[in-house]
Design a protein with these regions (language model features):
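Charged, often Cys/His-bearing segments associated with DNA-binding zinc-finger transcription factors
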Residues: 1-49, 424-458
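Basic, low-complexity intrinsically disordered segments
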Residues: 2-4, 46-146
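Short, conserved catalytic/metal-binding motifs centered on acidic residues
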Residues: 29, 69-71, 85-89, 109-115, ...
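Active-site- or DNA-interface-adjacent structural scaffold in DNA-acting proteins
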Residues: 102-278
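Flexible, glycine/threonine-enriched loop-and-boundary segments that flank and lead into catalytic domains
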Residues: 271-292
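Flexible loop/turn segments at secondary-structure boundaries
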Residues: 280-283, 307-308, 317-320, 351-355, ...
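Electropositive, glycine- and tryptophan-enriched low-complexity nucleic-acid-binding patches
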Residues: 286-334
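Helix-centered, glycine/charged polyanion-binding patches within enzymatic domains
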Residues: 336-410
Length: 458
């Protein structure tokens, strides 16, 4: 596949006399050290089959795989949007070196919308490759060993969607506005749009709910449903005269509006956002947040050091135990390059009653049959909770802005890859600090470092 930027050995003539990035930055910086250890060539080889081929004679050359992969890593590692990561890349020479640049660039690497198209091209399998290569790098650096990766902790959490808090009055008004906008866009004249009455009813319902006047609130909601039903039926009648393409485009929104009109508070599988019908309501028993709106995701981490070895979404809000086999299957696939198979899974009581062939499942519901060593491992189960917290606060897992169920799946994998990148940077910084301490001690006589009664024996 042709790439737009030249290789380091093929710099254009106007860049030959510019100072190279490696002469301007600190080569001991953790990001620089990590850029030397990540297997970029293997990553490009793994992702190339999933990308469209670019002919040598026509078409704009594609962006380098290392550039796009590096931007996706940095986006989630530093909790940035697509627009912000491109702007920060322009200002940061370390980020440019990490993504393969040779000299300092003064233009943004790509349009932010290109990252959206690249995510769609990579798909879930391509994002799994990004995550797998962070695990391979940690293993190659000997930050984790095979024995460490064979024991995993598995848990689930909620990846919230970027939607407003769903209320009946707001959803009904949004649906009415959307249908009126679609009719206007395609030249369909409605009998009445209720442009004044609709927003007024929404405000009244909100005021009554705030004052706990629920009988009056329900009266306003009934009126809102009546207005939405009138607009919906009027548009359905006049849609029969339109072209098939117009009917197909508007039919999707008519179906959602009909679903919203028919649902009641106690119904199952309700619609919580007009633009995101895949959103589900989940309760995790949190006092501060009784209900969360998004998708259930599973996280698998190494039992001792907390490296993420599996992350995926589970649409439909399944029982936690029903997700265990799929979660361990994904972890097995991500660990195949390091020749490791998960042998022990440490879980909470939400996974009771489920077994996976070839994997020992440990939870505290087996108290009468557990050995002392197994109990020590079960006490490590809570180690997954701070990992989930950092994923949400530092790597963007707390709010997903990507579209659809595919966006949910891609987002959680990107968050996991970003977390592992931060994990590797911390490991490199720790090794650097440790080496400085060792060098300082080796250059200082033991009599000055330690009291006479504590001198080290060689």
């Amino acid at each position: 596949m042709r790439t737009r930027r030249p290789a380091a050995e093929q710099l254009p003539a106007d860049e030959l006399f510019r100072s190279r990035l490696e002469n301007q930055i600190d080569l001991r910086h953790p990001l620089v050290q990590l850029s030397h250890r990540l297997p970029w060539s293997a990553l490009e080889q793994a992702l190339s089959p999933r990308l469209p081929a670019t002919t040598g004679t026509g078409g704009r050359p594609a962006l380098p795989v290392r550039l796009i992969a590096g931007l996706l890593y940095l986006k989630h590692a530093y909790d940035l949007s697509d627009e912000a990561v491109c702007e920060r890349w322009l200002e940061n020479p370390y980020w440019q070196f990490f993504t393969g640049e040779v000299v300092f660039q003064t233009c943004v690497p790509c349009d932010p919308s290109s990252l959206t198209r690249w995510r769609q091209r990579l798909g879930e399998a391509g994002m799994e490759e990004l995550l797998a290569h962070t695990i391979n790098t940690a293993h190659a650096m000997k930050a984790v060993d095979a024995r460490e990766l064979s024991r995993v902790i598995v848990d689930t959490t909620v990846q919230e969607k970027a939607i407003a808090h769903p209320t009946d009055s707001r959803l009904l008004e949004v649906a009415r506005k959307k249908l009126v906008l679609l009719a206007k866009r395609h030249g369909i004249a409605l009998r009445q749009t209720y442009a004044r009455q609709g927003p007024a009813l929404r405000r009244k319902a909100g005021r009554h709910a705030h004052a706990r006047q629920f009988k009056r609130m329900r009266k306003e909601l009934r009126r809102q449903r009546t207005l939405l039903g009138r607009v919906l039926r009027d548009l359905q009648r006049k849609l029969a005269q339109q072209e098939p393409s117009v009917r197909e485009r508007i039919g999707v929104w008519l179906e959602r509006a009909q679903r919203l009109l028919a649902q009641r508070p106690k119904d199952k599988q309700k619609l919580y956002a007009l633009h995101a019908p895949e959103v589900e309501c989940m309760s995790k028993g949190k006092a501060r947040q009784p209900y969360e709106f998004g998708v259930k995701v599973g996280i698998a981490v190494s039992a001792r050091k907390g490296l993420i070895v599996g992350a995926r979404s589970f649409p439909g809000n399944p029982y936690d135990g029903d997700t265990l086999a799929e979660q361990l299957e994904q972890a097995r696939g991500l660990l195949q390059d390091v020749d490791v198979i998960p042998q022990v899974a440490i879980v909470d009581l939400g996974y009771r009653g489920r077994d996976v062939e070839g994997v020992q499942i440990l939870h505290r519901g087996q108290a009468k049959t557990l050995t002392r060593r197994q109990w020590r491992w079960i006490k490590r189960r809570q180690a997954v909770e701070p990992v989930i917290g950092h994923l949400k606060q530092d790597c963007r897992l707390n709010r997903c802005h990507l579209k659809g169920a595919q966006g949910d799946a891609l987002h959680v994998l990107g968050c996991a890859a970003g977390y592992n990148l931060r994990w590797l940077l911390r490991w490199i910084a720790f090794l650097r600090a440790l080496l400085q301490v060792v060098r300082a001690r080796s250059s200082t006589p033991s009599s000055t470092m330690w009291p006479a009664n504590m001198a080290l024996e060689v």
